[in-house]
Amino acid sequence: MKTLLLTLVVVTIVCLDLGYTMTCCNQQSSQPKTTTPCAESSCYKKTWKDNRGTIIERGCGCPNVKPGIDLMCCKTDECNN
């Protein structure tokens, strides 16, 4: 019985992947790709235009944005590249 209980606990931990940390891209505009581990369950990519051209900001979470800023939020590793 103890073996069965231990097996169920191990299977539950493996299935839930309790130690999983999401990875999001965090480079700005056309910089080389960089990533960061995130505590949040989503990544974002904000895009807007100013006098320098198109600006892209990437990171963890899904922030609120001002009008005129395009926001794309997603929930898989490096989905905001």
From Swiss-Prot:
Q: Which UniProt keywords apply?
A: Acetylcholine receptor inhibiting toxin, Disulfide bond, Ion channel impairing toxin, Neurotoxin, Postsynaptic neurotoxin, Secreted, Signal, Toxin
Name the predominant localization: secreted
GO cellular component entries: extracellular region
On tissue specificity, the annotation reads: Expressed by the venom gland.
Compartments where located: Secreted
> Which SUPFAM superfamilies does the entry link to?
Snake toxin-like
> What cystine pairs are annotated?
24-43, 38-60, 62-73, 74-79
Keyword RNA-binding among UniProt keywords: no
Record's signal peptide: 1-21
Q: Which CDD domains match?
A: TFP_snake_toxin (cd00206)
The record's family statement is: Belongs to the three-finger toxin family. Short-chain subfamily. Type I alpha-neurotoxin sub-subfamily.
Task: Provide the function of this protein.
Answer: Binds to muscle nicotinic acetylcholine receptor (nAChR) and inhibit acetylcholine from binding to the receptor, thereby impairing neuromuscular transmission.
This chain's protein is named Short neurotoxin 1
